[in-house]
A protein has these predicted regions:
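Positively charged n-region of N-terminal signal peptides that target proteins for export
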Residues: 1-4
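Hydrophobic h-region of N-terminal signal peptides that target proteins for export
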Residues: 9-18
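Short beta-strand elements that form the blades of beta-propeller/WD-repeat-like
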Residues: 20-27, 32-33, 57-65, 69-70, ...
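Short loop/turn segments that connect beta-strands within beta-propeller blades
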Residues: 37-38, 73-75, 110-112
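A short beta-strand motif characteristic of beta-propeller blades
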Residues: 40-51, 77-83, 115-119
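Mature extracytoplasmic domains of secretory-pathway proteins
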Residues: 44, 54-81
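C-terminal partner/receptor-binding element of secreted or periplasmic proteins
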Residues: 102-122
Length: 122
């Protein structure tokens, strides 16, 4: 029983070891810096590959580079690519969702890049 508990504890430690909590993003010049909840810089990304950061939460951030919207996890890994013509203008990021406006419509998207809801922009 002790061996099972020890194995479970070790596996949980390794699974969460790389997961950072994104507290702040600083975009200066050609670099984007990610900071954790202790205020420590833990990742540096190039603006030439990421583009412009449009918004962030503690678990992910949204960036635009040319005609593409990219979703990145808190560790700075790109995991989803969406077209600007589909998403439109990103209005904000909150929690595990982000909101965009495309023409006369406002869309709410999940952090996975799935459209959750649509409403008229009035």
């Amino acid at each position: 029983m002790k061996k099972i508990l020890l194995a479970a504890a070790l596996s949980l430690t390794f699974l969460t070891a790389g997961a950072e909590t994104l507290s702040s993003i600083d975009q200066t010049g050609t670099w984007i810096y990610l900071y954790n909840s202790q205020g420590r810089k833990y990742k540096t990304l190039s603006t030439s590959s990421v583009g412009e950061v449009l918004g962030y939460s503690s678990t992910f951030f949204v960036a635009r580079n040319g005609a593409w919207i990219y979703l990145y996890d808190a560790d700075g890994r790109k995991y989803k690519t969406l077209s600007v013509s589909t998403v439109g203008e990103v209005l904000g990021v909150a929690g595990d969702t982000f909101t965009s406006r495309n023409g006369a419509w406002i869309y709410t998207w999940s952090r996975d890049g799935r459209k959750i809801s649509t409403r008229s922009a009035r």
